[in-house]
C-alpha cells in the first residue's frame, strides 16, 4: 500500500433543526397555549486513532465528511431527533491542524483516542420556550445554527523510540532488517528507501523498542534536494537518533564531510530536533580490517568534536549490533517519553456555538418585574375557559 503522510480534508458538522411555532388545538380547548418543540442538535464530527491504519491514502480520494442535520421541532412539544455523529479514523500518530487558523487541535497518540473536531449546530427553540406572564401566545422561534465547518490538515508522524539518520547507502535499512522483522528494500544505489518504515526490536519477552527508518538526506535537502526534508518530521517523536556513518563510502567521499552535511541539514530543519540525544554509529566495519576501522572511527569522531561513546557495527553480518541494541534499550528505559509526546490536548478547543443558547434566550426574553400577585403559571383553569387578562 502506498505510504501517504499528509492529507487535507473538509469536515462539516450537522446543522441544528429549527424550532417550531405551534399551539395546542383540541376539542373544547380553543386556546391551549404554545406547544412548539425544539429542533434537534446537529451531529458532531469526531476523529479516532486506529492502530490498524498506517497511511492517510484514503483521504487523498475522499476529502469531504458531513454529519447529519438535526430534525425540526414539531407540535405537541416534540423535540426533533438529534443528527447522527460521524467518526473519521486515522492512524495513530496523526496530528490534526486547523488550516484556517493554524491551530493544532490535537495529536492522536494512542489507540482508540477520540477527539471532536467540528461541533454540530445548536437546535432552534420552539415557541413554548418564549411563553411568559406577559406573552401568553408567543409566535417567535429560533432557527437552528449551521454546523461548524473546518478545513483540516492531517499530518502522520510515526511513533518510534529510535530514529535512523544518515546519507543514502549508509546502511540504515540494512540495520533495521538485521534487528527486526521489517524488510525494507536494500540495494547498492542511493535512495533505495523512498518512504519511512518501522521495525520492532524485541530484546526479550518483556523488552522491545521501535526503530524508524527514513529516506537518506543529502546536501541541500532543506532546499528540496533529493527527497527533501519532508520525512524528518517522523523523527520528532523519537527519544534518540542513531546517526549512521559509512566508514567506507563506495564513492570514496569524506565521512567527516558527510556527517557534517547531515548535521547541517538537521539544524536547518529544526533546532529542537538538532538538540535531541544523538549517537554516532559507524557502519560497514566488515569492509575494513579491525585496526583500520577503529582508527578511522576515532579520527572522524575527533574531527567532529565528538567526546561521547560511539559504536562500530556491521549491519550486514550483525557484528556489534546486539551490544548497540541493548544500550539503546537501557537508554529508553532510563528516559521515559517526554511529556509532550504523551497525548497532550489543548485545554479547550473553541467551537462556534458554545454560548449561543444563553445569548438567544437573553435577547428574546423581556425583563419582567416579579409580581407575586400575578398568576404566571399556565394551569388547567387557564385552558378550560375564556382567558381574561386584567390590567392595572
Curated annotation (Swiss-Prot):
Mg(2+) binds at residues 173, 193. GO terms for molecular function: GTP binding; GTPase activity; magnesium ion binding. It comes from the Bacteria. Residues 129-143 have a biased composition (Polar residues). Residues 364-386 have a biased composition (Acidic residues). Residues 1-159 form the Obg domain. Its EC number is 3.6.5.-. Residues 160-333 form the OBG-type G domain. GTP binds at residues 166-173, 191-195, 213-216, 283-286, 314-316. Keywords: Cytoplasm, GTP-binding, Hydrolase, Magnesium, Metal-binding, Nucleotide-binding. Belongs to the TRAFAC class OBG-HflX-like GTPase superfamily. OBG GTPase family. Monomer. This is GTPase Obg. It comes from Erwinia tasmaniensis (strain DSM 17950 / CFBP 7177 / CIP 109463 / NCPPB 4357 / Et1/99).
Amino acid at each position: 500500500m502506498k505510504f501517504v503522510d499528509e492529507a487535507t480534508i473538509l469536515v462539516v458538522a450537522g446543522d441544528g433543526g429549527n424550532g417550531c411555532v405551534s399551539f395546542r388545538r383540541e376539542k373544547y380547548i380553543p386556546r391551549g397555549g404554545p406547544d412548539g418543540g425544539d429542533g434537534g442538535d446537529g451531529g458532531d464530527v469526531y476523529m479516532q486513532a486506529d492502530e490498524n491504519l498506517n497511511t492517510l491514502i484514503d483521504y487523498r480520494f475522499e476529502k469531504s465528511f458531513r454529519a447529519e442535520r438535526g430534525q425540526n421541532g414539531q407540535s405537541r412539544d416534540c423535540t426533533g431527533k438529534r443528527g447522527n455523529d460521524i467518526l473519521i479514523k486515522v492512524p495513530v500518530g496523526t496530528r490534526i491542524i486547523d488550516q484556517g487558523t493554524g491551530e493544532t487541535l490535537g495529536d492522536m497518540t494512542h489507540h482508540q483516542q477520540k477527539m471532536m473536531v467540528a461541533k454540530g449546530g445548536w437546535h432552534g427553540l420552539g415557541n413554548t420556550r418564549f411563553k411568559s406572564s406577559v406573552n401568553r401566545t408567543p409566535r417567535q422561534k429560533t432557527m437552528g445554527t449551521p454546523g461548524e465547518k473546518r478545513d483540516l490538515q492531517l499530518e502522520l508522524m510515526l511513533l518510534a523510540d529510535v530514529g535512523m539518520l544518515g546519507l543514502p547507502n549508509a546502511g540504515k535499512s540494512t540495520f533495521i532488517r538485521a534487528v527486526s522483522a521489517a524488510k525494507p528494500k536494500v540495494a547498492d544505489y542511493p535512495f533505495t528507501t523512498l518512504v519511512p518504515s518501522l521495525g520492532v526490536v524485541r530484546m526479550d519477552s518483556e523488552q522491545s523498542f521501535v526503530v524508524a527508518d527514513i529516506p537518506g538526506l543529502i546536501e541541500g535537502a532543506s532546499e528540496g534536494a533529493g527527497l527533501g526534508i519532508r520525512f524528518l518530521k517522523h523523527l520528532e517523536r523519537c527519544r534518540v537518533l542513531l546517526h549512521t556513518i559509512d566508514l567506507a563510502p563506495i564513492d570514496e567521499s569524506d565521512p567527516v564531510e558527510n556527517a557534517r552535511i547531515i548535521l547541517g541539514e538537521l539544524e536547518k530543519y529544526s533546532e529542537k530536533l538538532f538538540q535531541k540525544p544523538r549517537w554516532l554509529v559507524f557502519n560497514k566495519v566488515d569492509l575494513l580490517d579491525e585496526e583500520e576501522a577503529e582508527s578511522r572511527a576515532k579520527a572522524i569522531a575527533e574531527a567532529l568534536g565528538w567526546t561521547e561513546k560511539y559504536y562500530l557495527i556491521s549491519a550486514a553480518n550483525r557484528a556489534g549490533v546486539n551490544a548497540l541494541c541493548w544500550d539503546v534499550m537501557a537508554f529508553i528505559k532510563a528516559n521515559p517519553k517526554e511529556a509532550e509526546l504523551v497525548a497532550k490536548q489543548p485545554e479547550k478547543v473553541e467551537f462556534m456555538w458554545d454560548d449561543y443558547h444563553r445569548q438567544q434566550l437573553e435577547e428574546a426574553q423581556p425583563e419582567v418585574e416579579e409580581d407575586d400577585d400575578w398568576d404566571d403559571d399556565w394551569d388547567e383553569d387557564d385552558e378550560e375557559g375564556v382567558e381574561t387578562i386584567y390590567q392595572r
